[in-house]
From Swiss-Prot:
Localization per record: Plastid, Chloroplast membrane
Enzymatic reactions: a (7Z,10Z)-hexadecadienoyl-containing glycerolipid + 2 reduced [2Fe-2S]-[ferredoxin] + O2 + 2 H(+) = a (7Z,10Z,13Z)-hexadecatrienoyl-containing glycerolipid + 2 oxidized [2Fe-2S]-[ferredoxin] + 2 H2O; a (9Z,12Z)-octadecadienoyl-containing glycerolipid + 2 reduced [2Fe-2S]-[ferredoxin] + O2 + 2 H(+) = (9Z,12Z,15Z)-octadecatrienoyl-containing glycerolipid + 2 oxidized [2Fe-2S]-[ferredoxin] + 2 H2O
GO biological process: unsaturated fatty acid biosynthetic process
Lineage per the UniProt record: Eukaryota, Viridiplantae, Streptophyta, Embryophyta, Tracheophyta
Family to which this protein belongs: Belongs to the fatty acid desaturase type 1 family.
Pfam families cross-referenced by the UniProt entry: DUF3474, FA_desaturase
Residue span of motif Histidine box-3: 368-372
GO cellular component: chloroplast membrane
Organism: Helianthus annuus
Gene that this sequence comes from: FAD7
Mode of membrane association: Multi-pass membrane protein
Expressing tissues: Highly expressed in leaves and cotyledons, while no or little expression detected in mature seeds, roots and stems.
Keyword Chloroplast listed: yes
Protein's recorded name: sn-2 acyl-lipid omega-3 desaturase (ferredoxin), chloroplastic
Amino acid sequence: MAGLVLSGCAIKPFSQSLPIPTKRFITNPSNINLLHPKDPIFSPNFHGFSRWAVKVSAPLRIPSIDQQDLDLDLERERISSLDVQEEEIFDAGAPPPFKLADIRAAIPKRCWVKDPWRSMSYVVRDVAIVLGLAAAAAHLNNWLVWPLYWAAQGTMFWALFVLGHDCGHGSFSNNAKLNSVVGHLLHSSILVPYHGWRISHRTHHQNHGHVENDESWHPLTEKTFKSLDWITRTLRFTLPFPMLAYPFYLWNRSPGKSGSHFDPSSDLFVPAEQKDVITSTICWTTMLALLFGLNFVVGPVQMLKLYGIPYLINVMWLDFVTYLHHHGHEDKLPWYRGKEWSYLRGGLTTIDRDYGWINNIHHDIGTHVIHHLFPQIPHYHLIEATEAAKPVLGKYYREPKKSSPIPFHLLGELVRSLKKDHYVSDTGDVLYYQTDDKLSKEK
């Protein structure tokens, strides 16, 4: 303690001759003369106790309970920071500690029930809205109304696609014939070859997250990326061109793949599926002929306004949504090949998105992780199934950012991904997107 009472102003320590008190507290005033006024700690001007000055300064620092508490708080913060660092180094590409069966077991049985009447009610609702919008726009025929019509009708075309998509998965009903009839009517009306797309989409689900075997929006390898001519490379990663890719995909598939959704001999299909592909191509051609005939009834300009522009809006919705469910630069989604790929790990590379008011309109397709793992679940059960599965998925589930009524925030996600997510390595089994610096600077 001697060092603690040394003065910073050269004051001497307590005299060694001072008696050591035997009592902790002085209760009798008469005992106060225990200390003589000539002792070195008192001023020589001492006259009684009315005027005296202690020549020992206060210690520079006295450990206190408050200081100890502060030290404990700092230690807790250090430990907490270590925990945060552990969270930050979570490896989304590592094999998950759960199995597909664990997720399935967590989902309530009612989520697997398909109600054809409920499914059909959505078809009736959407078709009625489509016809009502077209009738209203044709009647008003006002240039202030047309842009609103295009946005609304294009979104409804996209909603029809999602219902046809459910038919293709068999989540619409347990009746294969009903699924096929409704699927053809819905998809043909928006110029999609139902069976051709259904089969290729099945391939997409069976190989999701696989660099080479995935069917749609799969990453380009570095070799393929660098083999593209400048125009193709720029168009693929520059808006709005990627958002208009779907019709070209139906005809020619993605870069690095060959075949067509309209060609029954394409390597997309096995021989047993060729009749189905022909049927869908005939339905698609019939719809195209009907649209061509309507040109002579209402005129080509009116057809462009009533159908052509909404069709393009629908295509943009389709490309926008499907791209963002499998891309997100900030989310660092892994891709696999070889022995590292599995159905479960591939499905966990998908990501949910919140579309605000559009969620209900396009039948909750934004709840995409559970849909990809279990495409048999009807769309009207996906939200409940997702909530039930979250405790099992843990960190492998990426909570979507909450959207405003219109999902404008997703435009930023799209732009960042197109600017940074260009290709993956030609080698390795767990891969992440890499950036072409030259292409990134051009954007």
